[in-house]
Amino acid sequence: MSTEEFYNTIVIGGGQAGLAAGYFLAQQGQNFAILDGESRIGTAWRQRWDSLRLFTPAQFNGLPGMPFPGGDNYFPSKDEAADYLESYALKFHLPIRPDTKIDRLERDGDSYRLSSTAQSFKAKNVIVATGAYQSPQYPTFAAQLDPEICQLHSFAYRNPDQVPAGRVLVVGAGNSGAEIGLELRKAGREVWLSGRDVGHIPANQLGKYFGGRPYWWLISHVLSIDTPVGRKMQAQVRQHGNPLIRSNRKDVLNAGIQVAPRLAGVQAGKPLLQDGRTLDVDAVVWSTGFRPDYQWIKLPIFNGNGVPHHERGVVPGAKGLYFVGLHFQTALTSALIGGVGKDAQYITRFMQNS
């Protein structure tokens, strides 16, 4: 292993959260580096399904200091999002260290030691910005399905060609599930969409009639941990997922998708719904979200579900350790490209004043 490098602050992750944190650290004149495990900025976006478009309009997708290109109420593609992040890093000359995946973070005296396979680092402060969506989550009974049924997670889904012709069950009725279900239906599949109705925030209509301002104000200020309705929404979102934004339940029904209750388990190798019905399907697409994966952080800062204890991203009892980009960290927008900047600014200011 080469000589250890020391920085005042290290940001782990070069996605939207890490770049936003880097922007404010650069404004402060900090000695810092952004470590990312991929060889190219935006890889996480490029690896999503082919037709994916952001669930929020372009005018709400800018990081601090650089608006997202595109007209109002235009929903950018996932590749446009990736290109934007890459351009952002170049514009602000952010010190990205690609191909540097940290596999261990631990305390070392009054600093933190970070280790990768080829390099060791030390830092007074560490901002973990590895994203809200890490390891695909499946129900425990997924393995009980008949092996003849094709299974894949939304993380691995790219396009309908991966899914055999016939009947498809999409499990999870959030944004990803609804969008994938609509695409499969358009491609000629017979589709069931299983899951709880997560509600709908009509971004299209709000943007059309009010320039989108009430919509963004709602999801970034009202639906935050600072309001009673926001705290209630936080608990709901963490359990059931975000409300639909671009698509809605009416779109699903009009497309001819059959809406089904939540999945209860497996019976005789077939998906079993909560109403007692079993479905005879050829494929299942699990749009069941992601779970946190922080096994590489060797610090006692997590609850029983592997979620870090924090107050607005500040980890109590671990001076100098912070998170940015967590799911509903402070608001419904916390993990979105257009929302991470607010939390990144708070964290970097807090760190500077500590």
What is each PLM-predicted segment?
Residues 40, 49-52:
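Aromatic-lined carbohydrate-binding/catalytic grooves of carbohydrate-active enzymes
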Residues 50, 59, 110:
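Residues that flank catalytic or metal-binding motifs in active/ligand-binding sites
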Residues 2-38, 42-44, 73-354:
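Flavin (primarily FAD) cofactor-binding/catalytic cores of flavoenzymes
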Residues 45-49, 56, 67, 205:
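Short, flexible helix/strand-to-coil boundary loops that buttress conserved ligand/catalytic motifs
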